[in-house]
Amino acid sequence: MTAATKLQSEDLRCAVVAEGLSLHNVSRREFCAAGGTLLAGDKVVSGRFSGDRLISVRTEKLGDVDLEADNYILATGKYFSGGLAADMDRLYEPLFGLDVEYDEDRSKWFDASFSAPQKFLEFGVKVQDGRALKDGVKIVNLYPAGEILAGISSAQCDARESVINSAMEAAAAIGRK
């Protein structure tokens, strides 16, 4: 059972924002059978916040239609899937403008030796109690999971396990609400 199907089977309204590869590893039939709605080929492009809550998201294909849920799981991955982006002087989360943990000295982002650990792979969204931070404020219904999290790197031996565990932890936290 995946984190998304666990939430659906418990009748918890949750939107999963997944641009990374995680959705390709989920049984779509199982997810939909549990009550989930999959917008295949669509992409979340913005979110509307009110105070410490994410109220709704909008997608590329649905345009100005607001999709609302009680909780949201952000599983957008890191750089290759667009979950994180960088310019010459900063690293940022482009979808919601979430706080990101990274070294501000760009020269320390990588090691010249290709086989050495690369620090930039450890960068990611900051969390407090499993929830995302935006401008230092904990967003109480937004749970980052997977590689978008600071400290999780695809180069780690246990990366797959860390990604799965973070998603299950997000689902468990939502279930406890």
Region spans (language model):
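Residues forming the flavin
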Residues: 1-177
